[in-house]
Each structure stands twice: as C-alpha cells, then as structure tokens.
Curated annotation (Swiss-Prot):
Protein name as catalogued: Ribonuclease 3
Catalytic reaction annotation: Endonucleolytic cleavage to 5'-phosphomonoester
Domain DRBM: 172-241
Domain of life: Bacteria
Role, per record: Digests double-stranded RNA. Involved in the processing of primary rRNA transcript to yield the immediate precursors to the large and small rRNAs (23S and 16S). Processes some mRNAs, and tRNAs when they are encoded in the rRNA operon. Processes pre-crRNA and tracrRNA of type II CRISPR loci if present in the organism.
C-alpha cells in the first residue's frame, strides 16, 4: 500500500482518537505514542514500517500497569479479603474476556489500525486483538500522562464494573458470608427478593439476606443475583466488624 493511504488512515485515526479522549476526559501530549498503541502488526506489515512499530511492547507495559492499578484498587476496597481472594479477583479483572468487556463499553476497537487482510477477516472484533489494544493504550497513557491518568481512566472504565453481573463470581460474597456464619455457628442464611423497579431492559432489584429468618442486610443490583451479592457483601462486612 502507498504512503498516501497510510497517511489518510492515520489522519482518520487522529480525529477519532481526539474525540475519544475528549469523551473520556483525558489529556494527551504525544500522539505518535497512541498511534503505535493501536497499530496491529498487520498494519505495520502492510506499509513496510519498522518491525517494532506495532503495539506489542506497549501491550507488555500496559499489562503490568493494569495489574498494579487493579491491585491497589482491590487492596483499598476490600480490606477484609485475604491475599488469595484478592489474587483471584485481580486475575479475573485483567483477563482477556474482562478487558474486552471494558474496551467494548467505550468502543475502543474502532480506533485499531489494521492491515487490509486482518480487517477483512474480522480482526477488529477478535477478542485477543481487542484486549491487546486495551493494554497497549493503558501502556501509552502511562508513559504519556503518568499513573494518575491511568487511575482516572480506570475509575471511569474499569472499577465501576468490577461487580457487574458480567464479571460476577470474581468475589462471591454469598459464599464468604455463608462460611463466616458457619464458623460463628450463627444459623441458616436465606435470601429473598423484596422489590423490583424500572422498565424490563433496566430493572433494579432489591434483595435482603436473612439470618434465622431475620433480615440483616439489603442490596440492590441490575439482576437478582447481583442484588443478593450486594446484600451478602454488606452483611459480611457488618458481621466482621462485630
């Protein structure tokens, strides 16, 4: 392909990237760094660019930055959880399927620069390719704006969704609470749905957890399962404080 074609693709990227960063309320200084973050090896090969101009090195860096950022978040948010649970949570949050979920929430895949063949074969929606681009973007953001900017990005794109039903099972507070009650010989734990509100496509469920038939905590979520998890989390934390 010609350099003219490459420049046209990069100009299109520059505009879309500026719009995306504005939407995310993020600043940037070094545009070529982000061009590299979204450059798949197929794009580099099509235009005979430097063999290290693709995003794999930034992906490597972004992976480590994400692990650090998520580790700090979990450490602060769940002071009662032991190391094993925190490790399990972190692994689930930074795994490929989760990163694809986060990337898709902000349509990050539309920024990826692909070679002609990769584009034709559906590379833009390939999970491994999308998650790699997400990590590379985080790596570029870290180099360009520092860890504070990565934290700001994570507060908008990652942290609010850690307990979404899509990622549920990362921390199973129902099991945590059940095990705590068993250790304390406190009796039987049950759950009941006490309220549903909102239209079918955006329901809000409220559940409560009962100990020996007596309500001890309530929780809300977008699914019944999530509301039960929230109720169990509150009951678990309250019980640990006693």
């Amino acid at each position: 392909m010609t350099n003219h074609k490459k420049e046209a693709l990069l100009q299109n990227f520059n505009k879309k990237f500026a719009d995306k960063m504005h939407m995310l309320k993020l600043n940037y200084d070094h545009l070529p760094l982000y061009q590299q973050a979204f450059s798949h090896s197929s794009f580099i090969n099509d235009f005979n660019m430097d063999r290290l101009a693709h995003n794999e090195r930034l992906e490597f860096l972004g992976d480590a930055v994400l692990e650090l950022t998520v580790s700090r978040y979990l450490f602060d948010k769940y002071p009662e959880l032991p190391e094993g649970n925190l490790t399990k949570m972190r692994a689930t949050i930074v795994c490929e399927p989760s990163l694809v979920i986060f990337a898709n929430k902000i349509q990050l895949n539309e920024l990826i620069l692909l070679g002609k063949g990769e584009e034709k074969t559906g590379g833009r929606t390939r999970p491994s390719l999308v998650s790699d681009a997400f990590e590379a973007f985080v790596g570029a953001l870290y180099l360009d704006q520092g860890l504070d900017a990565v934290w700001q990005f994570s507060e908008e794109v990652i942290f609010p969704h850690v307990e979404d039903d899509e990622l549920m099972g990362v921390v199973d507070f129902k099991t945590q609470f059940q095990e705590l009650i068993h250790r304390l010989s406190k009796g039987n734990v049950t759950y009941r749905l006490i309220d549903e509100q909102g239209p079918a496509h955006h329901r809000l469920f409220t559940s409560e957890v009962l100990l020996e038939g007596e309500p001890v905590a309530k929780g809300q979520g977008r699914t019944k399962k999530e509301s039960e998890q929230k109720a169990a989390e509150k009951a678990y934390n309250d019980m640990k404080k006693k």
